[in-house]
Amino acid sequence: MIDLCSYLPPMLYGKELDEALTVLPPYAPNIVHADTATRLVALSDIYRVFLSNAMSREIYAKLYLGLLRSLQKKGSQLVTRQYVENQKAIQMEASAGILGGADSFTIIGASGIGKSSSISRSIQLISKTPIIVTDKPYRQVIPCVMVQTPFDASVKGLLLEILRAVDSKLGSDYCAKAMHSRNATVDTLIGCVASVCINHIGLLVIDEIQHIVGQKAGDALARCLMQIINSSGISIALVGTPSVIPFLSDGEYQLARRSLGLYYEPMEYDLSFQNLCTTLYRYQYVKSRTELDESMMRWLYEHCSGNPSVLVSLLHDAQECSILDGQETISYESLSTAYNKRLRMLHPHIKTTRKPSTSKVKQEVVISKAEPTKTIEEFSIVDIVKDAKKAQQDIVSCLKRHISVEEVRI
């Protein structure tokens, strides 16, 4: 049996991994002297900037090791037995999962923090060979296949999307055959997809998994994923936002066990965020260059809530607005204009509150003692009513002098 793991590139780590993950588009300082159109076009390069961080390094390691375990399984004798079971499922006969799916995991994090970018960069490094081809036996294996969960959580839609992704890489016609088959039910499609995964897929990444939340077909899709995990034996990564956590954790134990993995939140105001700001600030296309200081860096953090995607959009749009209105500089004014006009839709999702000071000096808060008040028990409502009647006064007004009275219109 051929060792498919030998086709993988060596696993990177440390400084070598950081350099491989980082993407810094070329930047010429004299671009600031170019015409407006040229600078506006070049400004889009800021979206290509990607810096390695703890999240991207961890995602790379998780994907690499997941692919490694998946390829190791393809060399075992259990693969042949599982393939026979999958053929039974295609023929609508009773079948069982043999390989198991302990290698599945999740990558959960807020939108815009760089999950998809980290996954894409990691897949590029892992898939140095787009298709692994062996002769004896002849086999074509795609190291990593990435698909998206259908917006309506359609089970059939996801299964066909997996087949379509394989066809686009190998030039096969699995999807067309499945769509035109007379027995193209969900059960037969699961068997077909599981067999395709065994033969041709190393690592399957399913993005936007949060689409299963709130959909009628969500539970069915979750059970379908669990069956594919058990029947294919490959590593499957489920990628989504935190909204999917209650669905996965509160569901069946088998699904929750196969959904363990990585969880990320927006960046803290630390050295990693400061390095990102410093790097992005180098890509200036306005005529008057400015330097980044601590005050500006804190302002940027407050108005992006530590979300790298929002930070990039803010710096891009601030320069674009400044170039178009003739200011030609990055200032608080241009940044505020971009934040208020271009990022208005994100305001409900951005907390523009300053982080609490880390100083050890604390202000002493003096709380004055409240004046003692009389309790209701010290007054007799009966006596108040009698006195009001004798003086021919409004009873409610008299009661309000001693207790809180709320009048309700009937």
Where are these regions (language model features)?
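Conserved catalytic segments around the Walker B and adjacent sensor/switch elements
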Residues: I131-P150
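The feature captures the helix immediately C-terminal to the Walker
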Residues: S120-Q124, V312
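Trafficking entry modules
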Residues: M1-Q72, F247, S331-I410
